[in-house]
Amino acid sequence: MAYPSTSGMIQASSSLHGSITRRNPEGYDMPSDLDQALLLYFDGQEQDKPSTQEEPHKPLNFVKETLNIFPSQPMDGEPTPTPKASMSAPPIAGFSRRSPAPAAADGRPLTLGKTSKAAFKKEGGSGSGGAMAASASSELKGPKTPDPKTLRRLAQNREAARKSRLRKKAYIQQLETGRIRLAHLEQEIQFTRAQGAFCGAGILSPDAALFNLEYERWQEAHHQVISRLRAAVEEHRPDGELQPHVDEAMSHYGVLMAHKARLVGADPLHLLSGLWKGAVEQCFLWIGGFRPSELIKVVVRHVEPLTEQQLAAVYSAQQAARQEEDALDGGLQALLRSLSDVVSSSDAPSSSQQTPPVMYHPSAAAAMAAASFMGQYGSYSNLQLAMDKLANLAIFLRQADEERMRTLHALRRMLTVRQAARCFVAVDDYFGRLRALALFWTTTRPHPAAG
């Protein structure tokens, strides 16, 4: 076996060097060309488009790509290059004519390494993991639409807050209205006390004070009812629209009679005395209210013209009201005479035993008044008999209120809807003028100079 000599190998090497020199007569810069080649190599590896074509002009010291048997990163996450993609890579013409290295948008060169690979894996390429990550990121970035249950709960919370504010506002208004009514009631009590109109021990019973407050509220509500009825009459509404207002006014008088019925059994003297009415109204008071026959006379003046049939019905109702009034007046006068006989009996108190002054406590004053009434030789039977006769006043008060309501219903039946509307408006105007006259008399009448 013959081996080539050393001189032959040297000649072959020199001839090879000469041939390479002849192919590249211009020469190249070793460090710069190597840097550019490495940069292009890593760029192609980052884009996963390795070139399999033979590059025509490569330097001697160019290191070819070798198989990475032990990769530093897992290979299952990176896509496998296809031959079609490898063949599509552009060939490298030469180091002196290559394009410059890729740069970022701001002009700085891209930094290749673990950061770019991690960003590529995070974006996901064309895999399903990237699509899921993109959809998750879009859901996080986009505005969230609440579900119907949350929207319904928010709407319920807003509605509850609105109702709470309305209740608070109504409660504050109610407190303010109650304060005004209480101040007005205190003024009336002081005015009545100054005139010496209190009966008994000089104080109002709790039931009487409650009734006064209820009557004030009823007057305010009745004023609103009549205001609506008056507006409907002035606007010439048809009978179908007037009918509900007329029925409302009629039923509101029933509310007043219910308030009076609750007080009749507890304190009939308060109703009979008329302290809950104005000073001028008390002059026209009849057994705790208005006289039915006088009310019919007032109404007829404001609902004319009437037909003959209506005139006959009105006259009949007026005659029936007067008969009932005469009967009640006779019974009440008989009761008062009987009460006077009991009080003026032989067991009445002597001159040395007088009714206690009002400065005493009510319970003590009541005890002393009972002892004074029975007298030194009297008995408890006379006092009990007088109390029973006072309690019988409630019977007359109930019958008088029943006659008043009966008269109102009779007027409602015999009149048309429009006439009935004018009837209730006229009744309210009548009592309103009486109250205004009392207020005018109290505030404007001249006071005599003190002598």
From Swiss-Prot:
Region (Basic motif): 149-169
Region (Leucine-zipper) location: 175-189
UniProt keyword Transferase, yes or no: no
PROSITE patterns xrefs: BZIP, BZIP_BASIC, DOG1
Any Pfam family hit: DOG1
Region (Disordered): 1-32, 70-151
Biased composition (Polar residues): 1-22
Keyword line: DNA-binding, Nucleus, Plant defense, Transcription, Transcription regulation
Compartments, record wording: Nucleus
GO biological process: defense response; DNA-templated transcription
Main subcellular localisation: nucleus
Matches recorded under Gene3D superfamilies: 1.20.5.170
PANTHER family on file: TRANSCRIPTION FACTOR TGA9, TRANSCRIPTION FACTOR TGAL8
Family to which this protein belongs: Belongs to the bZIP family.
Protein name: Transcription factor TGAL8
